[in-house]
Amino acid sequence: MKFLLLVLAALGFLTQVIPASAGGSKCVSNTPAYCRTYCHWGETALFMFNASRKCCISYSFLPKPDLPQLIGNHWQSRRNTQRKDKKQQTTVTS
């Protein structure tokens, strides 16, 4: 009984001392990024944590790029200008 209690105490202590290697540690406290040797599928490296480890973050947590907003129907207006250019070319050449 004493041996079983000693084994359980040792296992409880070891789980506190040995870090979990599968999950990785957090790189920065306010981002959902983890310090790993290799990034998982669906992740990208933000920066190198040290010489052999990267700070990996999921693509879903990356900020979306700001794209310019098109006003109105851009493709329709472009098509009309192309038609006008063709009409002007035919009238000039004939």
From Swiss-Prot:
Keyword entries, A-Z: Antibiotic, Antimicrobial, Defensin, Disulfide bond, Secreted, Signal
Entry's localization field: Secreted
Residues of the signal peptide: 1-22
Region named Disordered: 72-94
InterPro entries linked to this entry: Beta_defensin_dom
Top-rank taxon, per record: Eukaryota
Major localization class: secreted
Ranges annotated as biased composition (Basic residues): 76-86
Disulfide bonds: 27-55, 39-56
Function comment: Has antibacterial activity.
Name of the protein: Beta-defensin 132
Lineage: Eukaryota, Metazoa, Chordata, Craniata, Vertebrata
Gene field: DEFB132
